[in-house]
A protein has these predicted regions:
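PRPP-associated nucleotide enzymes
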Residues: 2, 8-168, 176-259
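Active-site-proximal mixed secondary-structure blocks
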Residues: 173
Length: 259
């Protein structure tokens, strides 16, 4: 019975209980009405939906013809630069903070936002985490190294050798930008990147046949987490017939670059 319970719990199939334990009203009632609320997978599904809706409403998730930093012609674009209001940047920070807690808990690190779009993400995430009791420093890089005043390549917190850093980015396509970030990280000897968080995992090939995020993980030795992935976006879009063309274009693109 215990094995069946665990099996059905993770498959989200409660029919087993409604038949075998139909005479136990309290047990059936708890599984029918309480279980979906308390199991994390249900909460996460609604959380992903809310995030995708947020990306669309804020103009961050766009469909059309775009060119990624890697040079690829892409049918959808994630542009954190469209986060233009205090309300939206605060909300974005809350989503990243939720992902941070979900994946690495209350680990003490420094947040790094690559210029330019990662800067506001790092600030917003730091604020959101602080509201939940985790006060993390943040910093970002200059595009041009400053040779006067405080100088250096970084603005904000100055990480020291041995400290752990978490990178917060908007998206990884082929991994071009994150590799540039890792070159910048080398300017501080002994710094350790603990993880990287992005809005969307596009599930695309990197330099080879593997997914870009998998390549990054293998190349640099840290995990890359996303709030949602392209499969979540496709599933969300397929619920509305008006999105049929966008879905087809994404799927066609993935026939070439999907990992």
């Amino acid at each position: 019975m215990q094995a069946n319970f665990i099996n059905c719990l993770f498959k989200r199939d409660r029919s087993y209980y409604r038949t075998k334990y139909a005479d136990d009203f309290a047990f059936t009632l708890s599984l029918t009405f309480i279980l979906p609320v308390n199991i994390g997978v249900y909460k996460m599904e609604s959380y992903k939906r809310e995030f995708i809706q947020f990306l669309q409403n804020a103009g961050v998730l766009k469909f059309g013809d775009f060119t990624a930093k890697s040079g690829r012609k892409i049918p959808y674009f994630i542009n954190a630069g469209e986060i233009k209001t205090g309300e939206n940047i605060a909300k974005l920070g809350e989503f990243y903070a939720k992902a941070y807690f979900d994946k690495i808990g209350k680990k003490q690190t420094a947040l790094y936002g690559p210029a330019y779009k990662g800067i506001s993400i790092a600030v917003a995430t730091s604020v959101a985490l602080a509201k939940e009791g985790l006060n993390l420093p943040f910093f970002f890089n200059r595009k041009e190294v400053k040779d006067h005043g405080e100088g250096g390549v970084f603005v904000g917190y100055k990480p020291q050798a041995g400290e752990e850093v978490v990178i917060v980015e908007d998206v990884i396509t082929a991994g071009t930008a994150i590799r540039e970030t890792m070159e910048i990280m080398k300017s501080v000897e002994g710094i350790k990147v603990a993880a990287c968080f992005v809005m969307v995992d596009r599930k695309e090939k990197g330099k080879g046949e593997k997914g870009a995020m998998v390549e990054i993980e293998e190349e640099f030795g840290f995990p890359v987490y996303s709030v949602v992935d392209v499969y979540d976006i496709i599933e969300y879009l397929e619920e509305d017939e008006a999105n049929k063309e966008n879905v087809e274009r994404i799927k066609k693109y993935r026939e070439v670059y999907g990992a």
